[in-house]
Amino acid sequence: MDLIKVVEQRFADLTQKAYPHFKSGDTITVAYRIKEGNKERIQQYRGVVIKMAGHGSSKRFTVRKMSENIGVERIFPINSPFIDNIVLNKIGKVRRSKLYYLRKLIGKKSRIKEKRI
């Protein structure tokens, strides 16, 4: 058996938190811990997941939000110790796994349909 895979699996078991299952197109809120000097605060980052990449302990996801008509994207590692929690707000209905086309759309065209449950 590959030694690197064994180490990654043990590391993932130690650092893995229970987050809800989400995919591209879902709207999530990430509570991210930010340290400024000797103070620490939690910032809520709400947006649409446009990409899931990697696997295992190196898995990461990209969240896009609109801030005053400017698109802001942020990449979060799934096993980051700075992520406090992740809340799934909406389940999106999309046919692609990478939603790069949202970068070109403006206004109501950039909305994603919500999946009915």
From Swiss-Prot:
GO terms for molecular function: structural constituent of ribosome. GO terms for cellular component: cytosolic large ribosomal subunit. Keywords: Ribonucleoprotein, Ribosomal protein. GO terms for biological process: translation. Belongs to the bacterial ribosomal protein bL19 family. NCBIfam families: rplS_bact. This protein is located at the 30S-50S ribosomal subunit interface and may play a role in the structure and function of the aminoacyl-tRNA binding site. This is Large ribosomal subunit protein bL19. The gene is rplS.
